[in-house]
């Protein structure tokens, strides 16, 4: 009977040890990060559920800021960022090694990922600051083209693919 109690105590101690180990692991390790982008301004980082929300917030800022992609942007949601004359922002888009695809059809009203309207003072710079420096940058795929007019668009590395199936593309601009 003494041997039996020792075996029961051993099993109980192993079980309690396993429970303690799992209870010490933070739950955030198991949580999926659903945020697509973050905005950094003056060393303050705010994460957003969508890239569109991040750009909407960044356009309102007067200080230079960085929109950083946190996960691949693929799917049916269309990113349509329009910079207007009221926008006086300086945004750096860090693709962070991810691809960005804007899936549009000819029937959709907003065929462009980024549109700069006449009179805007907005600046957009695209960079890749991922840890994997072998990758030059993300891939921007615009099935219906993109409009950049009266503005400056910088892209440091990566690939910009524009299919002319109804969009205006990049024309007569920097």
Segments from the language model and where they lie:
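Acidic Gly/Asp/Thr-rich repetitive segments characteristic of extracellular carbohydrate-active
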Residues: 35-70, 75
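Short, intrinsically disordered, charge-balanced linker/junction segments flanking boundaries
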Residues: 30, 160-162, 169-174
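Bacterial N-terminal signal peptides that target proteins for export
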Residues: 2-15
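A structural signal for beta-strand register positions
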Residues: 97-99, 130, 159-161, 166
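Sec-dependent signal peptide cleavage junction
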Residues: 22-36
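Hydrophobic alpha-helical transmembrane signal-anchor segments
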Residues: 13-24
């Amino acid at each position: 009977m003494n041997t039996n109690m020792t075996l029961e105590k051993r099993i109980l101690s192993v079980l309690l040890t396993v429970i303690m180990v799992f209870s010490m692991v933070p739950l955030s390790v198991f949580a999926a990060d659903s945020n697509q982008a973050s905005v950094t301004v003056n060393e303050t980082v705010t994460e957003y559920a969508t890239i569109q929300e991040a750009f909407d917030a960044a356009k309102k800022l007067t200080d230079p800021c960085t929109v950083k992609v946190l996960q691949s942007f693929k799917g049916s949601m269309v990113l349509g960022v329009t910079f207007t004359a009221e926008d006086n922002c300086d945004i750096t888009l860090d693709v962070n090694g991810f691809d960005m695809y804007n899936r549009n059809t000819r029937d959709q009203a907003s065929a462009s990922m980024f549109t700069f309207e006449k009179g805007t003072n907005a600046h957009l710079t695209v960079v890749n600051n991922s840890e994997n420096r072998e990758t030059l940058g993300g891939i921007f795929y615009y099935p219906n083209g993109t409009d950049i007019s009266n503005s400056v668009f910088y892209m440091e590395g990566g690939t910009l693919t524009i299919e002319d199936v109804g969009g205006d593309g990049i024309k007569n601009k920097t």
